[in-house]
């Protein structure tokens, strides 16, 4: 097909496409400096929400925290902030959305910027080479969005093409990889900055006897941001890829309506989590694996390196048991959960970072612990599952 002056549109179309798979070229992470110890968090939480007299509920919360397999978490909300903003410590009695959003509008982009600067530094290329920005958060719905704010904070060129991924929840760490792959492979020379930034100020509130799933969330979630540089056809000896993004998919688990959900209200984001979630994920995950890896003639799930969203200890335990996984497969996932809790969309990128670093420290032959192929799973509201097939990079 040709148009005016002999321009070949088909050749032009092909010239816009990259030759190879999208690669993750750099990873950066960031957390607030405030650290809460899980062993003392029940005392801290019930003291700051003025519920110390509710000893029965506090004991339940202690048991939830003890079973969480989490050692510590990072949180923006400090004791000082909570004292200045007591409406955050009520359950559902006092409107607090304005207070929350005033904090989140500043802190979510700020922490995202911190992670992005680390990724850009590792990448080693000028910011002017960034062509696209994907910004993901489940916390702030302002217009213009946090994507706009972080682009300003970083000083990105006004022509950078921005995509906002908002209100997706925990599965979105996979979503942004799917989007970044499509952008990088369909725009030759594109370099995509991916940023996920999450903050529990949107969900923090006082306890309730009638909403124990809310207590589960309060025991699991932490604050964090992760950033990636994604691009196809890395420049030899200049860019140093750590993983290739080979294939992606998204699906909704059958009969899972309402299993994980959140509602943004005047009191912030309320959280609902049904006890059936670990069963729903563990009984459906093999279907996702078969769909993803049958095309590569892989059926032994222990021959993969694993990056699984740490939705909670029960989910990881049941996935491990249902697939007969070697305990080492989820070691990086469990480590990140232990050190940071569930940071929603940012979690899987922390696990990617941990996997490549541990692989090098342990003398493995590839960034995937010595394995060539790997899987990344995101689980979240819907119940939605994101599946990403990754290829590791051999270490020199």
Swiss-Prot record:
Catalytic activity: (E)-cinnamoyl-CoA + 3 malonyl-CoA + 3 H(+) = (E)-pinosylvin + 4 CO2 + 4 CoA; 3-phenylpropanoyl-CoA + 3 malonyl-CoA + 3 H(+) = dihydropinosylvin + 4 CO2 + 4 CoA
Residues reported in the UniProt entry to bind substrate: 60-63, 273, 311-313
PANTHER family: CHALCONE SYNTHASE, HYDROXYMETHYLGLUTARYL-COA SYNTHASE
Pathway of action: Phytoalexin biosynthesis; pinosylvin biosynthesis
SUBUNIT field: Homodimer.
Keywords recorded for this protein, A-Z: Acyltransferase, Cytoplasm, Stress response, Transferase
Molecular function terms from GO: pinosylvin synthase activity
Functional summary from the UniProt entry: Catalyzes the production of pinosylvin from cinnamoyl-CoA and malonyl-CoA, and dihydropinosylvin from dihydrocinnamoyl-CoA.
pH curve summary: Optimum pH is 6-7.
SUPFAM superfamilies xrefs: Thiolase-like
Record's note on what induces expression: By stress.
E.C. designation(s): 2.3.1.146
Family: Belongs to the thiolase-like superfamily. Chalcone/stilbene synthases family.
GO CC terms in record: cytoplasm
Name of the featured protein: Pinosylvin synthase 2
Compartments reported by the entry: Cytoplasm
Pfam families: Chal_sti_synt_C (PF02797), Chal_sti_synt_N (PF00195)
Domain of life: Eukaryota
Site (Responsible for the different enzymatic properties of STS1 and STS2): 313
A biological process term (GO) from this entry: polyketide biosynthetic process
């Amino acid at each position: 097909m040709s148009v005016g002056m002999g321009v070949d549109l088909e050749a032009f179309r092909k010239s816009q496409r990259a030759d190879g798979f999208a690669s993750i070229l750099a990873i950066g992470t960031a957390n607030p400096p405030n650290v809460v110890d899980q062993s003392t968090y029940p005392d801290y939480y019930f003291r700051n929400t003025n519920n110390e007299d509710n000893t029965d509920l506090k004991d339940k919360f202690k048991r939830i925290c003890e079973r969480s397999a989490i050692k510590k978490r990072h949180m923006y909300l400090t004791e000082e902030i909570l004292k200045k903003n007591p409406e955050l410590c009520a359950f559902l009695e006092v409107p607090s959305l304005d207070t929350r959003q005033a904090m989140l509008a500043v802190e979510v982009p700020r922490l995202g910027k911190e992670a992005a600067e680390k990724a850009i530094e590792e990448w080693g290329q000028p910011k002017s080479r960034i062509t696209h920005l994907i910004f993901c958060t489940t916390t702030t719905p302002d217009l213009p969005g946090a994507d706009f704010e972080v682009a300003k904070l970083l000083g990105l060129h006004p022509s950078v093409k921005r995509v906002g991924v908002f209100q997706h929840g925990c599965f979105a760490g996979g979503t942004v990889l799917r989007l970044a792959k499509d952008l990088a492979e369909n725009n030759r020379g594109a370099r995509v900055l991916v940023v996920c930034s999450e903050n529990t100020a949107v969900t923090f509130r006082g306890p309730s006897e009638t909403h124990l799933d809310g207590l589960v969330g309060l025991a699991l979630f932490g604050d964090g941001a992760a950033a990636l540089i994604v691009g196809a056809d890395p420049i030899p000896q200049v860019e140093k890829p750590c993983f290739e993004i080979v294939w992606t998919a998204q699906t909704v688990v059958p009969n899972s309506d309402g299993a994980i959900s959140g509602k943004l209200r005047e009191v912030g984001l309320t959280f609902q989590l049904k006890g059936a979630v670990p069963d729903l994920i563990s009984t459906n995950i093999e279907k996702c694996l078969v769909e993803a890896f049958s095309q590569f003639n892989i059926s032994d799930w222990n021959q993969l390196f694993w990056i699984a969203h740490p939705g909670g200890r029960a989910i990881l335990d049941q996935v491990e048991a249902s697939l007969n996984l070697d305990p080492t497969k989820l070691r990086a996932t469990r480590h990140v959960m232990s050190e940071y809790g569930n940071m929603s969309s940012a979690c899987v990128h922390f696990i990617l970072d941990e996997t490549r670093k541990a692989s090098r420290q342990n003398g493995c032959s590839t960034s995937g612990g010595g394995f060539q192929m790997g899987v990344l799973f995101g689980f979240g509201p819907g119940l939605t599952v994101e599946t990403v097939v990754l290829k590791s990079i051999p270490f020199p």
